Amino acid sequence: MILADVLADYEKQLEAVGEEPEALSFVYRGLKQWDLTHFVLQLRQEVSEEDAELLAHVFSQLKNHKPAQYILGYEVFHGLRFQVDERVLIPRPETEELVDLILAENPSTDFKVLDIGTGSGAISVSLKKSRLLWQVTASDLSVDALELAKENAKLNQVDISFVQSDVFENISGSFDIIVSNPPYISENDKDEVGVNVLASEPKMALFADEEGLAIYRQIIEEADKYLTPSGKLYFEIGYKQGQDLKGLLSLHFPDKRVRVLKDQFGQDRMVVMDDEK
């Protein structure tokens, strides 16, 4: 059977169980290390026994709701490759927008930055790669996540200080920027989360108490002890949380400017607190 027919058959079955049918081609191409042109040229070719087994294995994992990036073992984020597995969330495009915003608003070369809840290290590594003179500290409650983040820093050849910490518990010093993309999904919104996300991605990195606001509240209540006088806070948020977080920040920092910004899909996705009121 030719590759196009094998893919078409499996893709119908994936669609029937609610999975993205194109994920199969995405993973197969990645595992074969083929560019798009080579992949298209192979579509009319007979599938070898070895490749038939590979496709069947990938299909089985996708059908059982394993995310494509976990099967591949990596995700590309902000132009960099990050190893990902079940220890961490898969970095999302919306988070790239947060990184771009921080870089655009902060051209300074000598900032100290803290990334709380670093996960795979996507935010901290991307910032450091673009601002080599910044001193970047990345923390996470999960020791397993930190191990993977360290591997990603090494893979992308950047020097970052990693700290195991529950928010500020083991953090010292003051920072020009504190950024966080913490767990922010409320248990009440569980039905909005994809099946493959619930099946595979770490729950402690997804869900938070207090309608998803618990970790933000922890950070906001202690942030003044760790920010420089002109320090800034950057959060990624759930699309329903913008006004709640704006209220919390305005309450604790009445003299600061607080902005709620939308992502490329028109949803509230970032909250920024800075000194430019």
State where each predicted segment sits.
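Residue-level signal for inorganic ion chemistry
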Residues: 27, 65, 95, 123, ...
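Short loop/edge segments at beta-strand edges and connector loops
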Residues: 72, 163-165, 262
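Active-site beta-alpha loop architecture of Rossmann-like, nucleotide-cofactor-dependent enzymes
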Residues: 69, 185-188, 240
